[in-house]
Amino acid sequence: EFCRVEPSYTRKLKAMLLFLAGNIPYEVNISKLASYLEISKNTVLSYLDSMKRAELLHLLYADNKTVTKMQKPDKIFIHNPNMLYALANQCQIGTVRECFVVNQLSARHTVEYGKSVGDFKIDGSVTLEVGGEKKTFDQIADIPNSYILADNLEYPVGKKLPLWIVGLNY
């Protein structure tokens, strides 16, 4: 009873995981999720916490310093991008990129959801925007200590870094 889940609710957990995989990155609406699963909001939050502890999900908050246990996350990602391909019918490449970044950087860093600027804030000081090789600095132009992590890039070009480089962090 690691997660304190009634055996009859395991189908709800599976349905929740499949729903989230198909809608990742999911900007959280606990009421809609609870309604979809036909469970209470507190149960949804409890299940999210259990799936986080089981390393099935990454729960991101815009400000990690003020997070409480029963607070809804700002964004949810599947823990490992490979799981996306196993659980979702189709995967958006942008979603896979972001899942990869969160998965790799969260092993050694605090990753926050960049709610207003950039995709992520790392250790409270570095702003990251994730995209393809044509990604521009428009969204993070005036932000100090900001970088783009770009797919299909072989080597760094200024503050534009290849996406694969975060894999060396693990």
Please annotate each region the language model reported.
Residues 145-156:
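Nucleic-acid nuclease catalytic cores
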Residues 88, 93, 133-142, 157-158:
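Active-site-adjacent loop/helix micro-motif of nuclease/hydrolase catalytic cores
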Residues 109, 124, 143-145:
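Short, well-ordered alpha-helix to beta-strand connector turns
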